[in-house]
Regions:
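Redox-cofactor binding/interface segments in oxidoreductases and associated redox assembly factors
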Residues: 64-65, 93
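Short, conserved loop/helix-junction motifs that constitute active-site signature segments
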Residues: 56, 82-88, 112-113
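Short, glycine-/small-residue-rich phosphate/pyrophosphate-handling segment
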Residues: 92-131
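Short beta->alpha junction loops/turns
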Residues: 67-70, 98-99
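Short amphipathic alpha-helical segments
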Residues: 75-78, 106-107
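N-terminal beta1-alpha1-beta2 submodule of the flavodoxin-like/Rossmannoid cofactor-binding fold
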Residues: 1-64, 71, 78, 82, ...
């Protein structure tokens, strides 16, 4: 669902995509994956990633997209963004969810992305992600004043 929304953003305003993938991966079973996510959240774990962005200095605008796990982004997203310098960047959070909206993600993004201008976030119901192109496109363009 999140990937679909990220692709809608790219189609609407351009840019590069970077997929956050953990070294160990997550279970494809929903209940097992949920349990893994909960354990990571409760332990404030930062899972190792297959790849990291080293530098975002060439970008002015960063869309941070992810599913809502335990009321915020997956801990793997934090593994990535906590090491980046967001000073002077525009950050647009998007979260796919199944009922929790943006959860605490805006507070977390504000805390982590020091020096950034945090724009209004967008919550997309996961079950409706494939039908959300118009809403995602409108939000992405408005976020960039395009």
């Amino acid at each position: 669902n999140t990937e679909i929304c990220a692709e809608f953003i790219q189609k609407a305003v351009g840019g590069d995509l970077f997929e956050v993938e953990t070294v160990n991966g997550y279970s494809s079973d929903y209940h097992a994956c949920t349990a893994e996510a909960k354990t990571e959240y409760e332990n404030n774990t930062r899972p190792e990633l297959k790849a990291y962005l080293k530098d975002i200095s060439g970008y002015d605008n960063i869309f941070i997209c992810g599913p809502c796990w335990c009321g915020t982004y997956p801990m793997a997203v934090f593994s990535l963004i906590e090491s980046l310098n967001f000073q002077g960047k525009n950050v647009m959070p998007l979260m796919t969810h199944e009922g929790s909206g943006l959860g605490r993600s805006m507070q977390d993004i504000n805390r982590i992305c020091k020096g950034a201008v945090i724009k209004t976030g967008l919550a997309v119901h996961g079950a409706d992600a494939s039908k959300s192109e118009q809403a995602v496109t409108k939000w992405a363009k408005e976020s960039l004043n395009v």
